[in-house]
Amino acid sequence: MKGALLVLSLAFSLLANAAAPTPEDRLSTVFQAIEANQPDVALKRIDALIQDHPNFRLAHLVRGDLLLARGRPLQTFGNVAKTVPQEKIDDLRDEALARLRAQRQRPSEGRLPRLVLQLHPQQKHVLVVDSGRSRLYVFANADGRPQLVADYYVTLGKNGIEKTREGDQKTPIGVYHVTANLPRGKLADFYGAGAYPINYPNEWDRRMGRNGHGIWLHGVPAALYSRAPRASDGCIVLANPDLETVGRYVQVGLTPVIIADEIEWSDAETVEAERKSLAAALEQWRAAWESRDTERYLAHYSARFSSGTQNAAAWAAHKHKVNAAKSWIKVGLSQVSMFRYPRERDFVVVSFEQDYRSDTLSNAMRKRQYWVREGARWKIIYEGAA
């Protein structure tokens, strides 16, 4: 038994200390007892865990192994009767391994996700999903920088990630935000403790021809504690207690949700240098617009630019016409956020409050731009209302 579960024990021992131990924390203490060759202690702990969370199927599998180990050595994790479908056992093994990998590969102190360059002051948290680890990380906004506060096991699409069409049972990759809070009382039991829809497809998804809808963060049916790592129709699924905790961090309309293949962790200095580079480009764009030097302004736009209704040529013609009629322009930017786009090289989503004033028009709006590095310069490839 010790040999069969030693690796799990070592991994789960790395779980963060919490004021109130989560079921995952308690499972780690079971494996610690197994590693210490204390099977009776392990069995007592797993029984207590199952009593409190009788729908935690992975815990039942571990208990079965503990009982079997009394009579014979275990050759592998999940030794159960052949009457149990192998697919169900494989799902539980996959869940155990996903939890294991996440705990063994926790980020070092001081490392930051390269995906998060800047949060604006009203965004209290950002949620980042590492699909390779089946993990959702919650980061707090610490003066614009992300600070890791918690992480949770999640279930993703049956057919993996990078959703492209309706019904493909894949989870999208991209930068999104929570659009609503759907409470338990308004949903079927399937969605568990509630749901938080996100804005898939976003502007870039639509430009790339991706379709579909109804991608939510949600819970699980009451009969379950958790699901296999790849079991949803594309949604991000958490255990109900975890969803309830994550819900306390969510601000509808504000909380970003970034879904990636994996999180690349970096030092704070590197992330800050990347942020400053893009912030400088954004300021140069703003100043060029104010200057009414239209060619200088348009130099910030890629030849591949599209607003969704205008390509680069149409956009240029429109801006020449508009700016020629202005005597002065003032542009103010505030509440700026910057997020790298997963799986795209040097591609960043920038959102901000824009206060535009001229001799003929005053307008305030929230704007979103997609910036791409072309050679040595950052350029805008999409711009529109957020």
Where in the sequence are the language-model features?
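Alpha-helical segment of the N-proximal tetratricopeptide repeat
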Residues: 21-48, 52, 284-287
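Short, aromatic-enriched amphipathic alpha-helices that serve as compact interaction elements
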Residues: 30, 274-292, 300
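Gly/Pro-biased beta-strand-loop elements
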Residues: 104-215, 220-226
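Surface-exposed, charged secondary-structure patches
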Residues: 122, 320-368
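Exported/periplasmic cell-wall-interacting domains
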Residues: 180-283
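Short beta-strand edge/turn micro-motifs at domain boundaries
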Residues: 364-386
